[in-house]
Design a protein with these regions (language model features):
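Short amphipathic alpha-helix that is part of the acyltransferase structural core
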Residues: 1-51
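Short acidic (Asp/Glu) patches
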Residues: 24-25, 35, 64-74
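Short, well-ordered beta-strand micro-motif
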Residues: 40-42, 53, 156-160
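Conserved beta-strand in the GNAT
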Residues: 47-56, 60, 85
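Feature marks short, surface-exposed loop/turn motifs that line or immediately flank catalytic pockets
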Residues: 56-58, 128, 163-165
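A short, polar/proline- and glycine-enriched secondary-structure boundary/capping micro-motif
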Residues: 60-65, 97
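Acyl-donor binding region in acyl/amide transferases
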Residues: 69-154, 161
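Charge-rich, low-complexity intrinsically disordered segments
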Residues: 153-188
């Protein structure tokens, strides 16, 4: 399941999870003030086990531009207002597996559909990139080559979120089919 971060306590849990994972992996910490929405992956036992953060994309102003020239990509130039950045995809070590990833990916699709985003941009670890491509069949394209950034090698990618939310039946990992029928947890 997934849920949107709504309270200060949930924000504290969100920060605790991604900071713990970043420190485990040796990444530099970077906090974000401006977000569209933050999500928590929730285990079947009700534990918060993962995070994802959707940030607005401001053509040429996101730090991600220092790694790859997203602003020059034709799909982004076409309609930058329908682009967002997904960041802080993190799962606590002892919960890593397909379900939390499915839940976080589902939260991303849910958010993209809710806000009418067409594309998400991101920097992915090469192993995670491969898993998304092979296991989850995420429609995405590389926007640049692999390079070192803030503690690890990353691959800059563009996700076709609109393709996923317009073709939900093609993605068996998706944990919701429409905005009113999902594995999203209601606010407590």
């Amino acid at each position: 399941m997934f849920k949107s971060v709504k309270s200060e306590w949930e924000l504290a849990m969100f920060n605790s999870i991604w900071v713990s994972v970043w420190e485990e992996k040796g990444y530099e910490l970077e906090y974000t003030n401006q977000v569209v929405e933050r999500f928590l992956a929730v285990s079947d036992d009700g534990e918060y086990v993962g995070t994802s953060e959707i940030k607005p994309y401001l053509l040429g102003h996101n730090e991600i531009e220092s790694v790859a020239p997203f602003r020059h990509h034709p799909k982004i130039i076409d309609d930058p207002a329908r682009v967002a950045e997904i960041d802080k995809i993190a799962i606590l070590q002892h919960f890593r597996g397909q379900q939390p990833i499915s839940d976080l990916l589902s939260s991303a699709v849910y958010c993209a559909e809710k806000y009418n985003f067409r594309y998400f941009i991101s920097l992915l670890e090469p192993v995670f990139y491969r898993a998304l491509r092979i296991t989850f069949h995420i429609p995405m394209e590389k926007v640049g080559g692999k390079q070192f950034y803030k503690g690890d090698d990353v691959i800059p990618v563009l996700f076709d979120m609109e393709h996923i939310y317009r073709n939900k039946k093609q993605y068996d990992w998706l944990t919701y089919q429409n905005s009113s029928d999902n594995r999203a947890m209601p606010a407590l």
